[in-house]
Amino acid sequence: MKRRIYIPFLISMLFSLLLFSQNFTPIAFDLAAPIDVNLDANGTPWVTQSGSGANDGLVQKVNPDGTKETIIEGLPSYFDFMLEELQGPLSTQVMADGRIFVCQGAGPDSLSQTIMEFHWDDYVAKGAPLVAADRRGTIWHGQWVLANGFDESNPYSFLIDGDGNFLISDAAANAIIKYNVNADEFSVLTEFPSFQNPTPIGPPFVQVVPTKILAHPDGGYLVSSLTGFPFLDGASNIYRVQKDGTTSVYASGLTLVTDMDWDPNDGELVALQFAAFGPVDTSFSFIFNSAQLIKVAETGGLDTIAAGFGPSPGLAFAADGSAYLTHLFLGQLLKTDPLSTPVFDLGKWQPKPMVVFPNPNDGRFTTNIFLEKPTEVTYRLTDLLGREVATGQVGHLPAGENAVPLDFSNNVGHGAYQLSLNAGSEWFVTKVIFK
């Protein structure tokens, strides 16, 4: 894949504040570009975060009371301004014996494109977050990939098979790479070829980008995929990959699948669709609240079981059938009620638009909102990484049309931001540009 996945979305997307029903509850906040969520042997979620581009990638454990415990910090995190991409850690697996494996994505650091091994015992003994220098071992995945005919490497996820070998999904090489631990040897298990672009928009061929790899109960593996630009609806597949590399389509008709897991209630596969791509404001981008959870039958049938959230790249099921989901742009970890076949759709809670004048501006502007009833109004301003820049009280406003003057000229830099106003059960969102 010529462009790293996810982080172009940070720059190109007009994102807004998500509203939650009783079925979706945020349980952790202020996460730094959360990608993956993985559960340990106790069912506790661990969240892999790509950071902000300042070598601040990290892995945190989210305790039942919502507190975050930083286990590993200071991992390579780099923002490429030319490509508009954030590059950092992408996934983590926590083993029952205390080993912690972190999959580090693409980037310029010497530890980019590797899988690093840490250990829980070292964290306990240190009494402080581990750093890269505390690692016990390194799988130099990217070095081998780049030396063996591939232009790029971006290890996204991995699994460890029954023999202790690693199957690595590379989202830039568009291949599954096998690492034999005992022999210290790499090999290509399978590659995913591009297909002809059926539209006049974008490049002549669309890349097939592998994301999550899972073991299939009957042997072999399942590999989810997303497609490159123009991010076509229904063009993503889940593939069945046998141990000899034989590859076939397991399920089709999906869109931008970034993760998948097994539903513990019925044993069926559930795929996470990151978001849909379409018209946003005056341009095309990834549509807020358009992520979906899709139940995938063994026969390939698809059934939507949750919708109206995200963009969300990471999924993990708890033992009771509730799902943990990362929200990339709001920097949150969500948890659902135990899922069943009825669709949980949050579409009716979509935020309302509001008008800002002037826009662009110097940080001083007026926004107009219409309130159904008198209520207290608060504001929240976030940057393009979803980080909170400013919050405050607007005050008690009457029902009807209201002009709300705001002034961020003294404490906010130039650039594009997301402004959200909360008025009780009503939410208003817009994009503002400070020049």
What are these model-derived regions, one by one?
Residues 25-28, 68-76, 125-141, 187-194, ...:
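Beta-propeller fold detector
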Residues 30-42, 56, 77-99, 136-166, ...:
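Beta-rich, blade/repeat-based domains predominating
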Residues 46-49, 101-103, 168-169, 222-224, ...:
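Residue position within the beta-strands of beta-propeller blades
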